[in-house]
């Protein structure tokens, strides 16, 4: 984890945010073009949405924690650009840490409390929200690798759910280069990001998939 400058610097192109004078790290969602952050509460409460989590992992308690936290976070953050995040024990399904008071748009700042908690825990699975309903970002993947997370999940405001793993660090500039290239080829922001992630998975030991419901 690098040190961050005192100046606040949001760089949309590269998905980097430098915040304050403390040593912080963060999950940062690359800004997409979808500005509708309202959550369809009827769908979030539906059986179809619940079934998405039935096989998210091979642990029923973890799946329940993922579902419960996703619903809570989406209800909480509907209509805003703020994110909530949860750290879950992959063995017991216990939520060991929650951040539900982030004041930074589309970001979770890793403060001392978070870093201390994850240093003392292993086999963590994370869940956080993406207000713009984009897939996992390059910084999500790198945070997963750097912090030794077993797996991560993203609950999008439009009801989509994504899972991801990362066993090595990726070059975020290359990711953004791919996104720009696919955008120029005519794909929308979501499609460009998905294709960029697929391209990276051919070179790096990372994986991203959409979590779908069972029929």
Q: Which stretches of residues belong to each language-model region?
A:
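A short catalytic or substrate-binding loop motif that flags glycine-/basic-rich loops and adjacent residues
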Residues: 77-81
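Short HxH-centered metal-ligating active-site micro-motif
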Residues: 12, 22, 100-148, 157
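Short beta-strand scaffold segments in enzyme catalytic cores
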Residues: 83-91, 153-155
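Active-site or metal-binding loop neighborhoods of secreted/extracellular toxin and effector enzymes
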Residues: 5, 9-14, 18, 41-43, ...
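Extreme N-terminal leader/targeting regions
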Residues: 2-61
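Charged, amphipathic alpha-helical segments
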Residues: 56-73, 134-139
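Short, solvent-exposed coil/turn segments at beta-strand boundaries
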Residues: 92, 147-150
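Short amphipathic beta-strand/extended segments with alternating polar/hydrophobic composition
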Residues: 94-110, 162-168, 176
